[in-house]
């Protein structure tokens, strides 16, 4: 039987697709401050109705059928409808449109992509309820402490099924041909290795400017320089979400890899720090991060850095020597090195003779160095797999949707789902499974056996400098960073303009966050009350 290897003590907390003002909290609490707990449906109760699933994944017909049929063996009068597609980067806007409708048609979605929506079920209300499909508390079916994805009112809005770890894949053959004998442990060494690769005629890095450089690594390296912001943003005694048993024993230790798992994040304290200038971006630290980024990018990236999203295919074809990516590619790259089916070639849009096998491995994030650095680099260790949120509707429909979610996120439902996934050619799990009691194939266990846990830099505030409150702000802030990387402004000018942007857009941030000025002024006040 499978039990999550990422333990509760070493749980992963992540911002996911939301900004710092959209998802708040920490893992470890047994219940959130949201609506009162409701009774689960009795095991013998027969349900009827329709559940519409519209998560961000695009499962195959076989996977959908396996889960639907397994559920309908227990609940034959329930119709399971799937509104899933390969929406990719369009999913957040698509979901926003669905949630804005007067009569919302979908029931189960990936709510972290619209984290400020106030109509999700507080899943913490069901954490201690007996799951009729496992005959144990739902808490025991799933690692609830992987992340704590909360809305501004403290309601848990999403549960994920897998963990993920981000690092750097590299082509050992190209490293050997260039005479590189040691992996880069520092940012200076990263630049040196890239210089040698470039001199050998190889483009060093395939990286995109959508979710990799301006998101993952913006978070990782902001965290290195700003770990002390924890002392400002963590809940203090008297705050509405302060947990004396948990927060009362917190001791700030920048060398603790899992520090972001050890405190409760209070978004009001973060927003207050931004508004009052206690937390600032026009600093030598921000300028130094950008200076270091400039030493690598766009200089050692592909020419299409700012527009590409397909860096994996470049790495597969040995057009680049290094690829930043997630644990999902441990299986995918292994499979692609072994065999590329006609269907896989068509998916990648490449010819069969475009790929030759090579030796590859991974290395962790090279450390930036200097007097302004406050900690060692962490990774992005967040959630992946399926993201499950439930739309709150009338009581009968809500109970039906939650019942299906409890089935899916337990061995009863996830086993046939996983079996159907592994039956598909080329399936590659994204990371360690977090559903208990599921029999996973030996090859899946082997994929993640050596996966390191470095701590998660995707804490709630680390991505704010390059994302703001999301939407157009993210586009604006990515463009501003590109101006600095392209030498149109200096790193110091960038830091100054960054601070001005955040100040000028405060009102928009407040609106998008779902907070009021009264909330920001008073961390003892629970948002939404």
What spans do the regions from the language model cover?
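Hinge/lid segment of periplasmic solute-binding proteins
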Residues: 112-166, 238-260, 349-364
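Glycine-centered hinge/linker elements that transmit conformational signals in sensory
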Residues: 194, 232-305, 349
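C-terminal capping/gating helix-and-loop segments adjacent to ligand/active sites or protein-protein/ligand interfaces
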Residues: 54-55, 59, 83-84, 151, ...
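N-terminal secretory signal peptides and thylakoid transit peptides that target proteins
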Residues: 1-19
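Extracytoplasmic/periplasmic substrate-binding proteins
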Residues: 66-68, 115-116, 202, 284-400, ...
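Pocket-flanking alpha-helical
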Residues: 65, 88-125, 137-158, 168-169, ...
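C-terminal lobe and pocket-closing loops
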Residues: 45, 331-340, 354, 369-479, ...
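Extracytoplasmic "Venus flytrap"/periplasmic binding protein-like
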Residues: 70-145, 173-185, 314, 321-322, ...
């Amino acid at each position: 039987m499978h039990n999550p290897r990422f333990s509760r003590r070493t749980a992963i907390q992540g911002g996911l697709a939301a900004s710092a003002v959209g998802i708040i909290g920490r893992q470890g609490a047994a219940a959130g401050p949201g609506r009162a707990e409701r009774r689960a449906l009795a095991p013998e109760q027969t349900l009827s109705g329709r559940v519409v699933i519209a998560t961000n994944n695009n499962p195959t017909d076989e996977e959908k059928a396996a889960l639907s049929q397994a559920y309908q063996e227990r609940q034959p009068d329930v119709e399971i409808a799937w509104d899933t597609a390969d929406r990719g980067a369009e999913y957040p806007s698509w979901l926003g449109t669905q949630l804005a409708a007067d009569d919302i048609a979908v029931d189960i979605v990936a709510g972290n992509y619209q984290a400020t929506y106030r109509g999700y079920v507080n899943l913490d209300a069901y954490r201690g309820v007996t799951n009729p499909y496992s005959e144990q508390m739902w808490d025991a079916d799933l690692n609830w402490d992987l992340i704590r994805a909360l809305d501004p009112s403290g309601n848990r809005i999403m549960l994920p099924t897998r963990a993920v770890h981000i690092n750097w894949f590299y082509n050992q053959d190209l490293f050997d041909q260039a005479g590189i004998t040691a992996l880069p442990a520092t940012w200076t060494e990263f630049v040196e290795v890239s210089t040698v690769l470039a001199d050998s005629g190889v483009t060093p890095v395939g990286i995109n400017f959508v979710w990799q450089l301006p998101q993952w690594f913006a978070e990782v390296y902001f965290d290195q320089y700003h770990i002390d912001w924890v002392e400002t943003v963590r809940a203090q005694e008297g705050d509405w979400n302060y947990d004396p048993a948990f927060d009362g024993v917190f001791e700030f230790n920048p060398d603790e890899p899992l520090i972001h798992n050890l405190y409760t994040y209070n978004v009001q304290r973060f927003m207050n720090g931004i508004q009052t200038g206690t937390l600032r971006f026009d600093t030598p630290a921000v300028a130094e991060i950008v200076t270091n980024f400039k030493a690598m990018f766009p200089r050692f990236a592909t020419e299409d850095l700012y527009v590409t999203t397909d860096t994996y295919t470049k790495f597969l074809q040995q057009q680049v020597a290094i690829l930043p990516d997630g644990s999902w590619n441990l299986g995918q790259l292994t499979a692609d090195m072994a065999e590329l089916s006609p269907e896989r070639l068509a998916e990648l849009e490449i010819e069969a003779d475009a790929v030759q096998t090579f030796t590859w491995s991974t290395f962790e994030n090279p450390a930036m160095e200097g007097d302004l650095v406050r900690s060692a680099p962490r990774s992005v260790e967040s959630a992946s797999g399926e993201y499950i949120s439930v739309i709150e509707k009338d009581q009968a429909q809500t109970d039906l949707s939650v019942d299906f979610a409890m089935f899916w996120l337990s061995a009863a439902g996830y086993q046939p789902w996983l079996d159907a996934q592994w039956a598909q050619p080329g399936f590659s799990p994204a990371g360690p499974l977090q559903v208990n009691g599921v029999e996973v194939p030996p090859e899946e266990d082997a994929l993640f056996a050596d996966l390191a846990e470095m701590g998660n830099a995707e804490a709630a505030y680390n991505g704010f400098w390059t994302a703001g409150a999301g939407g157009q702000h993210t586009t604006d802030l990515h463009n501003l960073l590109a101006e600095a990387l392209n030498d149109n402004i200096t790193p110091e000018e960038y830091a100054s303009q960054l601070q001005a942007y955040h100040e000028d857009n405060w009102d928009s941030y407040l609106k998008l966050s779902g907070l009021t000025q009264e909330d920001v002024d008073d961390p003892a006040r629970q948002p939404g009350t």
